[in-house]
């Protein structure tokens, strides 16, 4: 177990050592960007540290409607609703969806979308897709809800959804796009850029604002009727609102986000080039580079740590899950950082 007294950026101070940090998230690196931190400070001075009232109360803060309008536009949906965390947003979405039909979970769906403790499918995803299409099309008297992630950061995979075109009945499709929003698509609109437009799929998108944007908060976007129903739920009315300063900083940072997204894409491309002939796995050009597992002593994690390079390696999403070795790239990294990582991976034999 490693400890630090500082928040990591491209590096992290650990036990008196300044180590390269290839772990965590905050893909755009905004949490360490001076301009973004200045906007957060300005937002705090303008709005304080919280909005001290329920969003269902008789006094409303117009800032929330501004960010919800901007997010629904970005995500190409009719309406959006923001929460104080991505987990809360996902839980609100799934607790709404459970009343819309039988939940059909995709394999390895993130725990944020779990309704209680669902029995997730154990088969591979393609088999699950075939069975799901057959089940929905063969049961015209039933209502179904498809539940899935759009991006799996543990396997560095972007899931495809073109198979939704094969459905002959209308379904609600609840998708967690936490690792897509801000990263994928020409304007950072996320996975909606490649989701199929079909009359039988009604999308309800949920996402954390932390993974790309470095903000504690979450969003659910979809059809206006679904969002209106969510606003009548205790998840919305009884929870503390998104910190206003976070909403302010997000609304003021459009150009900065695009700049940092371009830097991130350049860094991803550079490390893809360096690792092209290695066992590093990243087929979709995500910020997540999957590293092979070895039984060596020392382990790859310890080998890199001894050389002041920290990668991601821990059991997730559950304590008994197998640790996954990953190198996470952000917009903050320099080419020399990735060259150093590549050098040590080569020395280890990756």
Regions found by a protein language model. Give the residues of each.
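N-terminal "arm"/small-domain region of PLP-dependent enzymes with the aminotransferase-like
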Residues: 1-52
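PLP-dependent enzyme catalytic core of the Aspartate aminotransferase-like
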Residues: 30, 34, 41-46, 62, ...
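Conserved N-terminal alpha-helix of the aminotransferase class I/II PLP-enzyme fold
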Residues: 37-85, 268
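Conserved PLP cofactor-binding pocket of PLP-dependent enzymes
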Residues: 57, 307-328
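Conserved PLP-anchoring active-site segment centered on the Schiff-base-forming lysine
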Residues: 83, 93-113, 133, 264
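Active-site phosphate-binding strand-loop segment of PLP-dependent enzymes
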Residues: 125-174
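Active-site C-terminal subdomain of aminotransferase-like
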Residues: 172, 179, 184-276, 281-283
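Conserved PLP-binding catalytic core of the aspartate aminotransferase-like
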Residues: 265-272, 276-308, 331
């Amino acid at each position: 177990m490693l400890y630090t007294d500082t928040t990591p950026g491209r590096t992290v101070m650990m036990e008196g050592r300044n180590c390269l940090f290839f772990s965590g998230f905050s893909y755009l690196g905004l949490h360490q960007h001076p301009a973004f931190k200045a906007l957060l400070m300005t937002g705090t001075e303008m709005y304080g540290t919280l909005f001290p009232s329920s969003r269902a109360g008789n006094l409303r803060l117009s800032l929330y409607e501004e960010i919800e309008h901007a997010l629904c536009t970005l995500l190409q949906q009719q309406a959006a609703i923001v929460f104080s965390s991505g987990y809360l947003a996902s839980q609100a979405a799934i607790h709404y969806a459970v009343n819309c039909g039988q939940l059909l979970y995709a394999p390895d769906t993130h725990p944020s979308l779990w309704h209680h403790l669902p029995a997730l499918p154990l088969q591979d995803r393609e088999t699950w897709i075939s069975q799901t299409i057959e089940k929905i099309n063969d049961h015209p008297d039933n209502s179904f809800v498809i539940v899935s992630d759009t991006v799996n950061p543990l396997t560095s995979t972007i899931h495809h959804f073109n198979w939704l075109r094969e459905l002959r009945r209308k379904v609600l499709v609840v998708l967690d796009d936490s690792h897509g929003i801000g990263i994928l698509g020409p304007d950072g609109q996320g996975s909606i850029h490649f989701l199929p437009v079909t009359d039988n799929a009604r999308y309800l998108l949920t996402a954390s604002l932390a993974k790309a944007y470095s903000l504690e908060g979450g969003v659910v976007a979809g059809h206006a009727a679904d969002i209106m129903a969510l606003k009548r739920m205790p998840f919305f009315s009884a929870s503390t609102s998104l910190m206003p300063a976070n909403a302010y900083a997000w609304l003021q940072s459009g150009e900065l986000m695009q700049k940092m997204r371009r830097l991130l894409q350049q860094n991803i491309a550079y490390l893809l080039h360096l690792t092209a002939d290695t066992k590093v796995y990243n087929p979709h050009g995500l910020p997540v580079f999957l590293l092979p597992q070895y039984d060596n002593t020392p382990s790859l994690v310890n080998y890199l740590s001894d050389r002041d390079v920290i990668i991601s390696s821990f059991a997730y999403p559950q304590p008994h899950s197998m640790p996954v070795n990953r190198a996470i790239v952000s917009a903050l990294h320099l080419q020399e950082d990735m060259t150093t990582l590549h050098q040590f991976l080569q020395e280890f034999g990756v």
